[in-house]
Amino acid sequence: DFVYTIGDFNNWEIDSNYLMKRTSYDNDTRWWITVNNLQHNKEYLFQYLVDGKLRIADPYTEKVVDPMNDIFIPKSVYPDPISYPFEKTNQIASVIQTGKEDYNWKSLNYNTPNKNDLIIYEMLVRDFVEDHHYLTLIDTLDYLQNLGINAIELMPINEFEGNNSWGYNPSFLFAPDKYYGTCLLY
């Protein structure tokens, strides 16, 4: 019946200024809100509070903070994670950051193999390199090329429940899993 947006920007309090608007189109109902006065390049945690009971993260978020699993991600893989406000909320929270710079592609100089000549290696990053880090994976590309591999199919890299899974239990399709490194390293 009602949904509030709660987060760092309103001290995780129910506030009528953060009551989401409800719009219906044919048989489709959408909830939306405009949040003002956010600082550019600052990360804010937030959740949706549904009917005053259920706290959920935005399923379309590009980053989540997971109070149960992020503590097991080594700092060498994901340095300086945003702190989870245990005293304010529970469950997974979404992260929003306005004013982010667009990703600047570093390599545009590559050739894709003909689809009839593909030799694909399906890979779970976590199991392929010991430290489960994308940078280490990049260092092993010569090894794969020497085997004749010309394409890599990564097993799911988006967030999923826990850190030790093949990723077939996805939960946030647009949020790369922090267990493999920061999004700037992808």
Can you annotate each of these PLM segments?
Residues 1-43, 51-74:
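Aromatic-rich carbohydrate-binding modules that target alpha-glucans
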Residues 1-6, 56-117:
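Basic K/R-rich, polyanion-interacting modules in nucleoproteins and related proteins
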Residues 9, 24, 37-39, 124-129, ...:
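Short, flexible loop/turn elements at secondary-structure junctions
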Residues 28, 116-118, 168-171:
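Short, solvent-exposed loop/turn segments at the edges of secondary structure
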Residues 56-61, 131-136, 156, 163-167:
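Short, solvent-exposed loop/turn and secondary-structure capping segments
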Residues 87, 95-151:
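An acidic-aromatic substrate-binding cleft motif
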Residues 144-186:
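Aromatic-lined carbohydrate-binding/catalytic grooves of carbohydrate-active enzymes
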